[in-house]
């Protein structure tokens, strides 16, 4: 080694020693063994972390396998869980159907077999029923006697007693009854014959007197009303009239059945007048109801207002059932229970709030996690109560009601986002969409004080047809239903106008 090389080696060692000395002074010196240990520690930590992750993963797999078993068992459990969920939803749907009645759906109250006890808000007292002391009496008015008054003689001991004297005052009591008797009027016309032409002649009989024996308008009107208005069967009508006339008048079943056609033919002009008056009314109530003819469904449409009613027969519902009825030409406000067909006619529409309240009640019972329908029912019930007190709403009050209506529907939207509707009970969600889309039709009555907020007028009218249909069970021909509609149109209109129905029926029959 040369002197130059030795010097260079010494210089490098010196520099290395200086650097180590500097590190020792600053406290940054780490020897190689320590570095190796720290590296090993970091490696072991990474391996431990991976081991812990594997432990958790395998433990989770173990628990899953222990709970679910094999893949086949897991698939079977998933399948059964899905079936159980569907079964629970089906049970919920069936319970909903079982609990449907006239209080939470459009079912008529007559279909409920066992009604609840009707609530009575009167306070219970110990007073006897009838007239109360201190209250004005409501006596039956006395009538003009049709026979001489029967004066009751006093007892003989009263007459002979000088302490009693007549006061000139009388106590009168009357018996009102009806006297049923058979009246027979015979018309006789002498026959004349021409000696030359052998022509036969007799005086003309009154119009309608075509048969040798005819029934008068009184007996026809009675039989007609019993069968078509009182819903008495043809057999019972025949039996009743035979009984009250002491077997003197025995109407044939064919005659009783033909009275509706005679009445219909005699009142064509009256029904046309009803048709025209309905078109002039500011609002019209309309509704369909089904019937059956020889096992086949048919429809009856009612068009009514407080003064006129028209029943229309049709084989089908929808647009076909409206053809030829007043609704087809009507341009004012229609009141109905959300039959979409009606929205193609008329100039305005008012939904029946009685139906809406029942649908809201159904949603309350079947969607317990939601609250929007409770708020909406409270709003609608309050509006109806408010309308009964005052129908003229101010613009400010109408604006407040509309804002509350929108707020409830907005809240309903948020609730259905959190609790989506069940496929087995979509009625609540559908009601929400309907009330949102047809807001104006639900609140139209606020701006029109004369507009009714329910369709009860049409419902009551159709209930009379349903009673007749229930008594008849089924009709034999479309003509019989159409004739019944014609007769009910006249009778119901006359009843609304306060006319005497017996006189109305008599006017339709000549004899």
Model features per residue range: what roles?
Residues 2-211, 257, 286:
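Short, flexible loop/hinge motifs at secondary-structure junctions
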Residues 18, 22-26, 35-38, 42-49, ...:
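Catalytic center-proximal scaffold of phosphoryl-transfer enzymes
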